[in-house]
Amino acid sequence: MTEDVFWRAHTDLPREAPGSEATTRLLLRLAGPLPSRPRVLDVGSGTGPATVLLAQLTGGDVTAVDRHEPFLARVTERAKAANVHVGTLAASMDALPFAPGSVDLLWAEGSAYIMGFDAALAAWRPLLTPSGVVVLTEAEWSSDAPAPEARAFWDAGYPAMRTMPGNVAAIARAGWSIRAVYVLPDADWDNYYGPLAARIEELRAEGVPDDRLAAVREEIDVRERHGADYGYTAYVLRPR
């Protein structure tokens, strides 16, 4: 079944969304000063490329949150290899079991869309300390008239996707201030799609039919043809 092929393709990928170590480092600097031992949540952590780096850079109490337990097992492996401690929690991001006012830094690279941008901003705000900060990356239209193929692809998976002005307005309505905005470079997409494309070829060599791989390959093909129409933007936010 297609879902099984999806998980086989995504097993052991270094990341589950566009990004890079350089981008994570930059966004952490843009987040500003944190307590000496901050409470950090990496929500929708995937296999933990940002989680482990955040633990190394902040020296904080870092927890990776994801619903897919094999991803969390990989987080634990990566943390052990890096000689840092990272907690893991299998939980839904729309019902995080943390006390109000307990989180200094909530990190969400490529995951807020799962519950929706506006819903994420509303649900996560009460968790923050008075000086807490949210760092997230969000898929956005960079064209007011994207190609029909790109529109059809994203409408199927994320029909609520907006432009940057639309998200900036939503952030203001939700009572947040924007500390920084950063558009992820093309190299960050390559970091995600390069390993995914290689994994697809491995599955093809193992005998998985092309028609079952097509759905996994589609997002790469759409990006190659219409990448100018959309991108990922990082927002560093504080409650007003």
Protein language model features and the residues they cover:
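Conserved alpha-helix/loop element of class I SAM-dependent methyltransferases that forms part
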Residues: 17-36
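A short acidic, Gly/Pro-enriched loop at the edge of an enzyme's catalytic core
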Residues: 94-105
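A short glycine-rich, Lys/Arg-flanked "PGG" loop and its adjoining helix->strand segment in the class I
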Residues: 119-133
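A short SAM/SAH-binding and catalytic strip from SAM-dependent methyltransferases
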Residues: 105-118
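Short alpha-helix
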Residues: 160-175
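Short, glycine-/aromatic-enriched active-site segment of Class I SAM-dependent methyltransferases
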Residues: 139-158
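Class I SAM-dependent methyltransferase SAM/SAH-binding core
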Residues: 41, 47-95
